[in-house]
Amino acid sequence: RGRNITWFVGDESSPMALRHYYRGGLIGKLVTDKYWFSGLKNTRAYREYQLLIELEKRQLPACRVVAANVVKSGLSYRADLLMKMVEGGQDLVALLTKSPMSDELWQEIGKTLAIFHKNDVYHADLNAHNILMNKDNKAWLIDFDRGEIRQQRGQWCQDNLDRLLRSFNKELNQLPQFYFEQDNWKTLMAAYNAELAIN
């Protein structure tokens, strides 16, 4: 089981995703979905909710949040987040197991990542599962748990990109079919750097 689990709810006219917060790592095997409560504003759901509201204000391509739910029990809490689904959204792993992506799509991803970084947005788990292409072939980022707006760009931007590249290489090594080549990464980075150069 991953760190978070998502259910798809709503109807065709208003599809939404409901994500329950689960712990990952070793502690997640002992305490699956309980977190220490030290105030509402410190909860994972509240912080992600506030971040997604800010990203929407900045018109960045991230999931539009609908509601957050925090249930306190003694000294701990459980939490959920309800978001609108990205119309026609498919993550990069799903896409790349089917067929190669065009240079234009790789450029779109690179440009989008640069726009988030120009807005000082830190994504704590940037990987191929957390980037979606929508029905119009526009890139969206999802899962901003533990993300934040930082004071300025720095080494964390490169760390984000390094994490994403490791994710592509991990899928390439683990999946029987995954259409990713180093030239794809070069195309992504060229678009990323070109966007960063624009004031």
Predicted regions and their residues:
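Conserved ATP-binding subdomain of kinase catalytic cores across diverse folds
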Residues: 1-90, 114-118
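A short beta-strand motif that forms the metal-chelation/ATP-contact edge
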Residues: 79-84, 138-144
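Short, glycine/acidic-enriched loop or turn micro-motifs at the edges of active sites
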Residues: 87, 128, 146
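AlphaC helix of the protein kinase catalytic domain
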Residues: 91-100
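Conserved alphaE helix
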Residues: 104-112
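Conserved catalytic-loop position in the HRD/HxD motif
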Residues: 120, 125, 143
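Hydrophobic residue at the +6 position relative to the catalytic HRD Asp in the kinase catalytic loop
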Residues: 126-133
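C-lobe/activation-segment region of protein kinase-like
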Residues: 139-199
